[in-house]
Amino acid sequence: AAQEAEMRKKNGSDPPTTTKEQKAGTPMPAYRESAADKKLSGSFQSNKGHLPVPITGPYLITSHYGINYVEGLKNVKINNHGVDIRGHMNCQARAVFDGTVSAIFEHPQIQGSYIVMIRHGQYISAYFNLSELKVKKGEKVKINEPLGLIKADMSGNYTMQFQLRRDRERLNPEQWIG
């Protein structure tokens, strides 16, 4: 039973919890929005297909959202939770919309590589493989504001992974970028 509970937790399939104010069987929202957050969420939603590319300068999408087959390796596939965007030396990640920096993490396996997460009401944008950060947790950011430099990856390419979520639901970023 403990193993089963742990698997449900990892897979995000735990049943919703209840409180005294909540009737049994009524799921709690993942994020409680203030009036300002609701307005921001609505504004973010209305910009679907028109958000700026989250990288400065020329770019190339090198890996798309969803299942991707690895070139040269038969039957090997990777599930990409975002898009991988290659830029040039000194290119920067930039905020795709107004929001608040909700978290900053150092990548556990790549020293000096950071992940920046920005909350836009119910929506979250995440920017992976950054260095020389220009923002701090809790800071408000504006659309197109620089977040940090994109770090060279192990191949020497300046590649950033960009992800979008609505609460816990993963979204295809290519459907949101204009």
Language model region names:
Residues 106, 135, 146-155, 178:
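Hydrophobic alpha-helix feature that most strongly marks membrane-spanning transmembrane helices
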Residues 104, 120-140, 144:
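Short histidine-centered loop motifs in beta-beta connectors
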Residues 93, 99-101, 138-150:
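A structural signal for short beta-strand/turn segments enriched in small hydrophobics and glycine
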Residues 157-164:
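A beta-hairpin/wing motif
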Residues 1-98, 103, 108-111, 117-119, ...:
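Extracytoplasmic/periplasmic cell wall- or extracellular glycan-interacting regions that localize
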Residues 167:
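Short proline/glycine- and basic residue-enriched helix-capping loop/turn segments at helix->loop/beta transitions
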Residues 63, 87, 103, 129-132, ...:
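A residue-level detector for short acidic-glycine micro-motifs
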